[in-house]
């Protein structure tokens, strides 16, 4: 929205007039002149004082970010992404010094990921990856806590993973909150109350994976009572946030009117969006819909993609479409569709 700046309003009268003096009123004229000079001098002095005070830096009367206790500082800055951390470190020297441990943790996370995935000329070594993540976690980074928790979880050391997820969650990390919620569902014995608490907190913090997981629990009555209205609300939020599985599920809900009014147009919209983001079942469903409408060329593209994505049911339908295309347009149409599928790339998805 374009902002508008209104003109400044005069502090004086709307109208002004010159004083009317007779030529012989010299004493009066002299008095007025001296008053005007004094007023002007006073105004200039006041403006100068105001300008100098506004140019001075604000006092440190209330302290600043770097003066906060370390545990509070970590609660604020621990979830910072690398770009945000770098930007905050450029504010002033005291901020740069205060955030030094977190900047070190970012470097450790980078090395940890190299060791975990064998990237950047480094041979994969899970022990070294975990060591780097733990060192980053010791410096207060919630990102490192989550990464270390993932390694422990993959190793089957679930209690250690849960402890790290909980530390990250209490510092406000949405990914840690989501992982903690899912962990409480999967550990033995499970803890549904804590699981829903952390999933909802993560979802409210805007993490789309948590929004989708929360919707699944509410939709299928998993660990909580079924609530279709709430489920579709969270499916829609996750879908709008770019989570492809939520796009597919909200399409199905619109298609059958589950949890919200039936709306075929919105169902088609979300099914196509899921298909364009690479969801193989959505590609199959969308391909079938196009086939039923006689859109053979478009249909065969989505059916080809669905088959490549592992949807076995797409194969017989695709063969029927191939036969009809060949009979109508010749074999060139089929080759064109396959060429399109070879060059097709999914739209980016939110993990």
UniProtKB/Swiss-Prot annotation:
Residues 1-60 are annotated as: Disordered. Residues 42-59 have a biased composition (Low complexity). Gene3D superfamilies: 1.20.1280.50, Tetratricopeptide repeat domain. TPR repeats lie at residues 142-175. Sel1-like repeats lie at residues 105-141. It comes from the Eukaryota. The keyword Signal does not apply. This is F-box protein At1g70590. It comes from Arabidopsis thaliana (Mouse-ear cress). The lineage of its organism: Eukaryota, Viridiplantae, Streptophyta, Embryophyta, Tracheophyta.
